[in-house]
Regions:
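Beta-strand-centric surfaces of beta-sandwich/beta-rich domains
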Residues: 2-116, 123-263
Length: 263
């Protein structure tokens, strides 16, 4: 008879802590992985997210978001994206999410008001299997599907927003175990500076870690002791290039733990 060989994990004798968290086996522990790219960072620090530009502008107050697409095929019965999941934090920094039915270039308001936008992803799509245009979450006047102020977006072909930034929910402490910067620019003698920045509630952004590398390389930082971030702290990866125009990607891994397990 064939013999079944059970692994240590299967028999329950040992399993890595990080895997237990990812499997939802440890109460009040959550796993968070963030990544984003800025296709053209400047000579001063730029936030690494797919909205580009220099530094990301956060909402000053919780606001209803307008969800729209640059393409008319992203609609409830279209060939592109039909519904998207929006996730973020409310005015009290509590986690909230909702599913929004798209209406092409016409904006659809969220039910919730968001103080922080975390991510957005396509849930259902038509025959195309993907979003036909760029999908936006923002505020202000919407022109051809593009809001005046953008807080998050899904790039065509990705089906999910990308951003190397995140805010710690109320009642939790976040612990960063690693972060990475990668530059795809192979032009010789271009130097990339990476920065991990955080802003405590009511404070200003300060640098927590930095790196330097030549373009076309990656820099991985694994913390021997995880870096702790208090509730309501904004966290983001930034990069600068000695010559403007470099594409830089950033990613980080966090485990966030409830401060009072009895709450």
């Amino acid at each position: 008879m064939p013999v079944t060989a059970w692994s240590i994990t299967q028999s329950g004798r040992y399993e890595p802590f990080e895997l237990q968290v990812a499997r939802g086996q440890i109460t009040w522990h959550e796993n968070q992985f963030q990544f984003g790219v800025n296709q053209s960072v400047g000579t001063s620090f730029s936030t690494l997210w797919n909205g580009g530009g220099t530094l990301y502008a956060y909402p000053s107050a919780a606001t209803v978001l307008k969800i729209s697409s640059s393409d008319t095929n992203d609609t409830s019965a279209g060939t592109g994206a039909r519904t998207v999941l929006v996730n973020g934090l409310d005015a009290s920094y509590n986690e909230i999410s909702e599913t929004v039915i798209l209406n092409g270039q016409t904006a659809v308001n969220t039910v919730n008001s968001y103080l922080r936008f975390h991510y957005m992803e396509v849930v259902t799509a038509g025959s195309g299997g993907t979003a036909a245009g760029t999908i936006y979450a923002g505020v202000g006047t919407v022109t051809s599907g593009v809001p005046a102020t953008i807080y998050g977006q899904i790039t065509i072909g990705y089906n999910a927003s990308t951003s190397a930034m995140w805010t710690v929910p109320a009642g939790y402490t976040a612990y960063m175990t690693s972060c990475t910067w990668t530059s795809s620019n192979t032009t010789a003698n271009i130097a990339i500076t990476g920065g991990l920045f955080s802003r405590v509630y009511g404070g200003v952004f300060t640098i927590e870690s930095t790196c330097k590398m030549l373009a076309g390389n990656s820099f991985d930082r694994h913390f021997d002791t995880a870096v702790a971030f208090a509730e309501k702290t904004d966290i983001e990866l930034r990069a600068a290039s000695s010559t403007a125009g470099s594409a830089v990607t950033g990613e980080f891994h966090i485990i966030y733990i409830k401060n009072d397990a009895n709450a």
